[in-house]
Amino acid sequence: LKELKSLDLLKKEEKQIMVVPYGDRSGVVIEPWLTDQWFCDAKKLSIDPIKSVKNEKTKFVPKQWEKTFFNWMDNIQPWCISRQLWWGHQIPAWYGPDRKIFVALNEKAAIIKAKKFYKKNVKLIRDPDVLDTWFSSGLWPFATLGWPKKNYFLNKFYPTSVLVTGFDIIFFWVARMAMFGMEFLNKEPFKDIYVHALVRDEKGQKMSKSKGNVIDPLKLIEKHSADALRFTLLSMASPGRDVKLSEERVKGYRNFLNKLRNANNFLKMNKCDFKKTSKIPKISININKWIYAEFIETKNIVEKNIKDYRFDEA
């Protein structure tokens, strides 16, 4: 304030009530601190992914999540990609004696650039910051396949067919993968984006360690079986609705599966033939014809629902 007054730049001074932010984990006051950071021109990178979704080259399932995607992408701001952390992909930038920046693939390449600029050998200091984790994650669809080298795996598996993800990271992860895929390979990284529900506790609250409401799936599997948990989650996987998971629901589907298992055991006891065959059986008894027709109709409905990502209906 004294400096502003001395420069005659202070217009007004008054008391204000402020909301003081505290860290979730540390519990201490968060103080804003201006520092130099690296930024990415996200607006430029967002153009092609937006076109891809609008032209239906990339589809969201359910379609309603397109609105969330467009809302983020149409209002995107410069992306701060540097982080002051101990672990991560270190930013490939080195500083000369006068803070001149040299960006290179490795230190050897940076030294060559610096020598060319200064006309002599100089000591370089590497930027200590690392990349934002979502920057690294955005490279996942092709970095895992050997990129930047062109090889069999990259040609065969990029782009992929389906990405399965939660709605809470559409912007943080999905959008970044789309931006990098279009920028570096000129192809959408995936054709369909299936946005599944969040699994919450029985009261609809988001699970967190701090709340103490985390349901351990391994304990549910140990107690009620993996099939019971799978059946529960699939039956509740209605598009656009979160899952309110409780042990009672898992127990109920376990009991239902027990009935199916008992029916199967009954057929085995009566020496029913379960040999796999592609041949259509010859059926003469009317009731068996009806059973077979119902089976084929059910099979077709299940296959269509799975293709349409309606796992709850399947």
Regions found by a protein language model. Give the residues of each.
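Short, solvent-exposed positions on alpha-helices
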Residues: 172, 188, 251, 309-314
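Generic structural signal for alpha-helix starts
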Residues: 61-62, 159, 281, 285
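Short, glycine/acidic-rich hinge or "gate" loops at secondary-structure transitions
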Residues: 89, 187-193, 268-282
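A generic membrane alpha-helix/interface feature
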Residues: 45, 154, 184, 243-245, ...
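Residue patterns forming the tRNA-binding/recognition surfaces of aminoacyl-tRNA synthetases
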Residues: 1-98, 205, 211-256, 261, ...
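Alpha-helical recognition segments enriched in aromatics with Gly/Pro capping
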Residues: 84-88, 92-241
